[in-house]
């Protein structure tokens, strides 16, 4: 989205004195620095990451490298056009793999690989354009899971998480325990022996034991909270996942998305009108059977737990955080409080 300009340390690197017309698929017109080309963004990000690693190779470092792909505008470099044999979106993803490889190669060259934790993951599930792409190419970005980016269904939240850490993470190992990217903050803090302040990382639990191969309930009795693009909540603990709303909580799957290209969306299922949804994610990871009426005790328990988290402003032990409830329409599932109710201060 415009303005098209790089930012370094809270300052633009150059004034966007030019104007860019729609150049690539999904691009938007707007102010830009002279000579801006979308296809140069990903190589530039990678160059910056590699340069930072080179400058800090003698001391511990942390690099967060969020790439512009596969977001719009879809603008793969010239060398990658046609590489996926699918479409420009696929070509863009091939380029992502290339630039991750560049970082890995540099770590190897600097002899840092054996002492560096590398994580490759995604912030959400695939875009809804995966449905026509699945029909056209047979490629299913969300696998068999229901929903997409923005949704509280599994397809909206389950993402790849690939981690390499020689000496800690066993090569070729697999973790079957669900965790959240929110947990990264507590994980990195534990790795670095840093104690987080009581008001930071209030929903974060370290997954270091999982990285060490200790599969199990790393969260104990603490649940994971999901949040959709419309602000709707879901809560997950153990085998159970409770969506505190009807439908996806995010994307609309109306008449325009009921064709065979969108097979699997909620409006084609019998429980589409339920105002809450309960799934056993161990036996029904595809979220096909709503157990909201069959397991009321689970619904009550998880609803109460979610309410406790909201009122405390956190899902981990610690002091209560400031929470504003009165103007939060997505909390319509929360038990009503007296009109003079005021949330407790931290």
Q: What do these predicted ranges mean?
A:
Residues 72-76, 82-88, 92, 109-168, ...:
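Histidine-centered active-site microenvironments of extracellular/periplasmic hydrolases
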Residues 31-43, 82-95:
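The substrate-binding groove and active-site-proximal loops of carbohydrate-active enzymes
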Residues 57-63, 112-118, 157-159, 219-221, ...:
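Loop/turn elements at helix/coil->beta-strand transitions in domains of secreted/extracellular proteins
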Residues 24-34, 78-83, 164-168, 282-287:
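Short glycine/proline-rich turn/loop motifs
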Residues 63-73, 120-128, 203-204, 226-230, ...:
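Short, solvent-exposed turn/loop segments enriched in Gly/Ser/Thr/Pro and often Arg
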Residues 184, 237, 249, 259-277, ...:
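Long, internal low-complexity/basic segments
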């Amino acid at each position: 989205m415009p303005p098209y300009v790089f930012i370094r340390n809270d300052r633009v690197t150059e004034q966007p004195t030019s104007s860019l017309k729609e150049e690539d698929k999904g691009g938007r017109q707007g102010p830009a620095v002279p000579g801006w080309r979308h296809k140069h963004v990903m190589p530039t990000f990678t160059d910056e990451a590699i340069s930072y690693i080179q400058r800090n190779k003698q001391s511990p470092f942390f690099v967060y490298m969020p790439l512009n792909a596969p977001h719009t505008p879809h603008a793969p470099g010239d060398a990658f056009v046609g590489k996926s044999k699918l479409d420009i979106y696929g070509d863009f993803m091939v380029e992502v793999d290339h630039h991750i490889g560049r970082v890995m190669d540099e770590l190897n060259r600097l002899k840092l690989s054996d002492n560096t934790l590398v994580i490759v993951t995604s912030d959400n599930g695939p875009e809804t354009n995966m449905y026509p792409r699945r029909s056209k190419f047979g490629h299913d970005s969300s696998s068999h899971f229901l929903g997409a980016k923005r949704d509280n269904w599994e397809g909206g939240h389950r993402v790849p998480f690939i981690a390499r850490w020689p000496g800690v993470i066993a090569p070729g190992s697999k973790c079957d325990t669900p965790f959240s990217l929110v947990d990264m903050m507590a994980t990195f803090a534990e790795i670095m022996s840093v104690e987080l302040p009581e008001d930071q990382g209030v929903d974060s639990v370290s997954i270091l034991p999982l990285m060490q191969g200790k599969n199990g309930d790393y969260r104990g009795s603490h649940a994971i909270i999901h949040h959709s693009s419309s602000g709707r909540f879901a809560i997950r603990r153990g085998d159970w996942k409770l969506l505190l709303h009807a439908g996806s909580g995010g994307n609309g799957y109306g008449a325009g998305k009921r064709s065979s290209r969108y097979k699997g969306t909620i409006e084609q299922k019998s429980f589409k009108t339920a105002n809450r949804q309960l799934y056993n994610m161990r036996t029904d990871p595809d979220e096909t059977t709503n157990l909201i009426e069959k397991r009321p005790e689970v619904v009550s328990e998880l609803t109460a737990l979610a309410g406790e988290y909201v009122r405390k402003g956190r899902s981990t032990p610690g002091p209560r955080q400031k929470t504003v409830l009165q103007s939060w329409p997505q909390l319509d599932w929360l038990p009503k409080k007296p009109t003079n109710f005021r949330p407790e201060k931290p």
